[in-house]
A protein has these predicted regions:
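General nucleic-acid-binding
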Residues: 1-30
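Short, amphipathic alpha-helical "recognition" segments used to contact nucleic acids or chromatin
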Residues: 52-67
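Recognition helix of helix-turn-helix/homeodomain-like DNA-binding domains
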Residues: 59, 84-91
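The DNA-recognition helices of helix-turn-helix-type DNA-binding domains
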Residues: 65, 79, 90-93
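Short alpha-helical "recognition helix" segments of helix-turn-helix
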Residues: 70-76, 83
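Short, solvent-exposed alpha-helical "recognition" segments
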Residues: 88-100
């Protein structure tokens, strides 16, 4: 492995905003789905990736179907606590990133 010179931008930090910004920058680097999957595998445990994937799936189901929380729970096994959390972010939270991602993917929430 080739040696690299130290990056002057990399320094120990406990600042949550700086750490989050650095993570966001890293998450923007994959060029395709395979690269993103590899990055997620490096960053997250399999359980963490599964949790993220479940939240995304629930968001799509809530946005694109008339399924109830109970229906989603029974069909997916995702806890109702998680379903309620995702629903709150879809409806009330200012971020609206779930909806933005679905819009950019041309996704109304329905599975293919």
């Amino acid at each position: 492995m080739a040696e690299t010179s130290p990056d002057p931008e990399v320094a120990p930090s406990r600042d949550p905003a700086r750490l989050a910004a650095d993570l966001c920058s890293a998450l923007l680097t994959p060029r395709d789905e395979q690269e993103m999957a590899r990055l997620l595998a490096d960053l997250c445990t399999p359980a963490e990736v599964r949790t993220l994937a479940e939240r995304w799936h629930v968001a799509r189901l809530l946005a694109g179907t008339d399924l109830t929380y109970r229906d989603i729970h029974e069909a997916t096994g995702v806890s109702t606590t998680t379903i309620v959390r995702v629903a709150r972010f879809l409806r009330q939270e200012p971020y609206q990133a779930y909806r933005l991602a679905m819009q950019r993917l041309g996704d109304n929430g329905d599975d293919d």
